[in-house]
């Protein structure tokens, strides 16, 4: 989860988020090299007295500054496309959960279980217990088994919402009348926090998401207790 004065990403807990972190580092390296080159050229122009007033054209230079940016864009686009296709892949999900956005709470339905559904509201600040996080705790957490592929079907009952959990690399729009889907796979147990990431009204800031990822045997006990 995030912590005060954090400058980087949250720790990755899914294969997709790990790939996104690698892609971020790859792109940042390219941006750093380009910025260094531009700063060097600017400083050289400001500090040297040499000029080329007689130069009418420079085919070699024009060729280089056309081909080099194209190569750089390709080195950025190829890994990006790979991750986009990975995010769209859904291979034999262990279960399906339907998520509906409302003003201003989330509702969840475990479609593989009979009558296993609930609403998830933010816990008011006045009701928080010691150690709980303000504006991030909910009355009903989404409990999921660890190391199992989960398909999330996401939509909305009223206005645009967005279901986002940064540490899992997830952000999917909840659109009224449209059903979006994404996959979720956590490689370690724990609590993972997210929030609605699409402005949806006056209480947009009070739509937290809490995923509780547990071993399979604990998930089975929880699902039995909820039925």
UniProtKB/Swiss-Prot annotation:
Localization of this protein: Mitochondrion inner membrane
One Gene Ontology term, aspect cellular component: mitochondrial inner membrane
Lipid bilayer topology: Multi-pass membrane protein
Binding sites annotated in the UniProt record for Cu cation A2: 196, 198, 200, 204
Keyword match Ribonucleoprotein: no
Residues reported in the UniProt entry to bind Cu cation A1: 161, 196, 200, 207
GO biological process: ATP synthesis coupled electron transport
EC number(s) given by UniProt: 7.1.1.9
Regions of this protein lying in the Mitochondrial matrix compartment: 46-59
GO molecular function term, any single one: copper ion binding
Mitochondrial intermembrane side: 1-14, 88-227
Chain positions with Phosphotyrosine modification: 218
PROSITE patterns in alphabetical order: COX2, COX2_CUA, COX2_TM
Primary localization: mitochondrion
Record: residues binding Mg(2+): 198
UniProt entry tagged with the keyword Ribonucleoprotein: no
Subunit structure: Component of the cytochrome c oxidase (complex IV, CIV), a multisubunit enzyme composed of 14 subunits. The complex is composed of a catalytic core of 3 subunits MT-CO1, MT-CO2 and MT-CO3, encoded in the mitochondrial DNA, and 11 supernumerary subunits COX4I, COX5A, COX5B, COX6A, COX6B, COX6C, COX7A, COX7B, COX7C, COX8 and NDUFA4, which are encoded in the nuclear genome.
Family: Belongs to the cytochrome c oxidase subunit 2 family.
Protein name: Cytochrome c oxidase subunit 2
């Amino acid at each position: 989860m995030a912590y005060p004065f954090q400058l980087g990403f949250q720790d990755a807990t899914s294969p997709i988020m790990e790939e996104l972190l690698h892609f971020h580092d790859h792109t940042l390296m390219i941006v750093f090299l380009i910025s260094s080159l531009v700063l060097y050229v600017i400083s050289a122009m400001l500090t040297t007295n040499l000029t080329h007033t007689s130069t009418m054209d420079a085919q070699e230079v024009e060729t280089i500054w056309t081909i080099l940016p194209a190569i750089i864009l390709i080195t950025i686009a190829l890994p990006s496309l790979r991750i986009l296709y990975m995010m769209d892949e859904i291979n034999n999900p262990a279960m399906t959960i339907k998520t509906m956005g409302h003003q201003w709470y989330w509702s969840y339905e475990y479609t593989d279980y009979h009558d296993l559904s609930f609403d998830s509201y933010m816990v008011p600040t006045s009701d928080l217990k010691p150690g709980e996080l303000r504006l991030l705790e909910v009355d009903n957490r989404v409990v999921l088994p660890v190391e199992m592929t989960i398909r999330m079907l996401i939509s909305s009952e009223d206005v645009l919402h967005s279901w986002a959990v940064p540490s899992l690399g997830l952000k999917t729009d909840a659109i009224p009348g449209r059903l979006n889907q994404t996959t979720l796979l956590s490689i370690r147990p724990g609590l993972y926090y997210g929030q609605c990431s699409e402005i949806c009204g006056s209480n947009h800031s009070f739509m937290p998401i809490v995923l509780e990822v547990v071993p399979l045997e604990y998930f089975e006990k929880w699902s039995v207790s909820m039925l």
